[in-house]
């Protein structure tokens, strides 16, 4: 059975870096260079470690893009810059009333898709609620759920009285989605037990990826709870059948720095 790796024999030094990097131990080094074992045909997780680890750039993988996106190695030495970005992250609850260009949101999600997923299954799906009117509909659906909670004399998550949030909404103040211009929702297949963790990791990565673009974010926890507990809210979000929301971010330009 053919190997799923292609090797440039004139470049390969048979150093074994690719075999050492393979998390599934699917690569063997022979006289003609590395080859994959038969099990790799079905079980390779397509992580790309083998190609990335080759110091000579001699490997290509039949199921991966021919060229990997190059990395600027300078970032590895900027420990202070990375730490400052992580420490400087804030939950933003006041936004400028202007849209973010779609290309910028796409760039944020493009970075977020590199967040880790179990076995490289990449189960995260995205829904971007772009128009402000649609964002307000989701906030309204969440308020409807809270009205029902108040009417039943219950508390949100067994702790919080939602009536002040409902009163604020009725007074024209949105404390649910903070009048943000956009919402990013991460969701996955309901039958995939790894989707929840992957979505949370991806949203966390999106938070950081948004910072260099001058964007602020905040987790939309009330919307998430409504989506889990209130069928009309789930319907308002409009996910594909068999899918479940695992988290959401408000996103936009901060009104204050």
What are these regions (language model features)?
Residues 121-130, 222:
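Short loop-to-beta-strand entry elements in the cores of soluble alpha/beta enzymes
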Residues 1-21, 25-28, 86:
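Ferredoxin-type iron-sulfur electron-transfer modules and their immediate structural context
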Residues 13, 108, 112, 182-184, ...:
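Small-aliphatic-rich amphipathic alpha-helix that forms the alpha element of a beta-alpha
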Residues 127-199:
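Glycine/small-residue-rich phosphate/adenosyl-binding loop
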Residues 20, 71-106, 246-257:
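Specificity-determining recognition surfaces
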Residues 32-45:
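Short linker/helix segments within small regulatory modules
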Residues 147-155, 159, 234-257:
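A glycine-rich helix N-cap at a beta->alpha junction
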Residues 17-34, 49-66:
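Iron-sulfur cluster-binding cysteine motifs and their immediate structural context
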């Amino acid at each position: 059975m053919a190997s799923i790796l292609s090797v440039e024999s004139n470049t390969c030094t048979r150093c074994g870096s690719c075999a050492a990097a393979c998390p599934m131990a699917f690569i063997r080094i022979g006289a003609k260079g590395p080859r994959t074992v038969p099990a790799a045909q079905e079980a390779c997780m397509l992580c790309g470690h083998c190609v990335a680890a080759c110091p000579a750039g001699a490997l290509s993988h039949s199921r991966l893009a021919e060229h990997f996106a190059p990395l600027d190695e300078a970032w590895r030495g900027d420990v202070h810059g990375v730490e400052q970005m992580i420490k400087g992250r804030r939950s933003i609850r006041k936004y400028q009333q202007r849209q973010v260009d779609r290309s910028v949101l796409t760039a944020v999600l493009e970075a977020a898709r590199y967040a880790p997923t179990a076995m490289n299954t990449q189960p995260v799906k995205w829904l971007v609620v772009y128009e402000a009117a649609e964002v307000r509909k989701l906030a309204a659906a969440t308020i409807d759920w809270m009205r029902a909670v108040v009417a039943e004399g219950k508390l949100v998550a067994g702790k919080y009285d939602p009536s002040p949030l409902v009163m604020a909404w009725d007074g024209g103040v949105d404390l649910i989605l903070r009048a943000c211009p956009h919402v990013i929702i991460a969701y996955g297949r309901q039958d995939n037990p790894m989707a929840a963790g992957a979505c949370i990791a991806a949203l966390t990565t999106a938070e950081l990826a948004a910072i260099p673009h001058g964007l602020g974010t905040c987790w939309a926890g009330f919307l998430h709870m409504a989506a889990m507990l209130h069928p009309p809210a789930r319907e308002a979000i409009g996910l594909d059948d068999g899918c479940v929301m695992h988290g959401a971010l408000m996103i936009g330009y901060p009104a204050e720095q």
